[in-house]
Design a protein with these regions (language model features):
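Positively charged n-region of N-terminal signal peptides that target proteins for export
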Residues: 1-5
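Hydrophobic h-region of N-terminal signal peptides that target proteins for export
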Residues: 9-17
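Hydrophobic ligand-binding cavity/cleft-lining segments
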Residues: 16-59
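Hydrophobic/aromatic beta-strand elements that line small-molecule binding cavities or substrate pockets
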Residues: 25-27, 53, 79-86, 112-121
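A short, structured loop/turn motif at beta-sheet edges
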Residues: 30-34, 58, 85-93, 118-128, ...
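Hydrophobic pocket/interface hotspot
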Residues: 36-37, 46, 64-66, 84, ...
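Beta-strand/loop substructures that line and gate deep hydrophobic ligand-binding cavities in soluble
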Residues: 104-151
Length: 169
């Protein structure tokens, strides 16, 4: 029988230097690391739980493009484009937004931000996922972006947990 979803959210802010500010979301997913890795790093994976349409080129400098609206055109104005900065297969993925969707309120602030996603075994069929957002400044625009990702990353983690919980039933 599957265990209940568990979600632990940690927020860490280093007040001394803007460069040290980070946003951390962490939780356990009821699936092995390999399955969670594929859910984040393959077209089939991201389209199964995260986005309506997507594509990913898993390589340094590769693009991860997606849209949330099934009616939107991938490559059109609503496309979100992230560039892969680095990765260690099955362990870590770092990305930076290189194209925000048209009308995104934080388009300037996001230029300084990047995310690192860690995948760690938390048991034979469980994965501890840790999403770290970095590059937030002390200015108002950057703090608004931070709030946006605080909600968004928590939501993303919850959706991933729900996706695998449904598969386990």
């Amino acid at each position: 029988m599957r265990t209940a979803l568990s979600l632990t959210v940690f927020l860490c802010v280093a007040p001394l230097h803007a460069a040290e500010q980070k946003l951390v979301h962490e939780g356990v997913v009821d699936a092995p690391v390999d399955a969670v890795w594929k859910a984040f790093t393959t077209k089939e994976g991201i389209e199964s739980w995260m986005v309506a349409k997507g594509e990913i080129e898993l390589k340094i400098g590769g693009k991860m493009r997606s849209v949330y609206d099934a009616k939107a055109v991938l490559g059109g104005p609503q496309t979100i484009e992230n560039t892969i900065l680095s990765f260690e297969p099955g362990r870590m993925l770092s990305i930076k937004n290189t194209k925000a969707p048209e009308g995104f309120a934080h388009a300037e602030a996001i230029k300084n931000m990047w995310s690192v996603i860690y995948f760690d075994e938390a048991g034979p069929v469980r994965t501890r996922l840790r999403i770290v957002g970095l590059g937030f400044g002390e200015d108002e625009a950057s703090q608004q972006l931070r709030k946006h990702f605080d909600w968004g990353n928590a939501y993303t983690l919850k959706k991933l947990q729900e996706h695998f919980a449904k598969q386990g039933k």
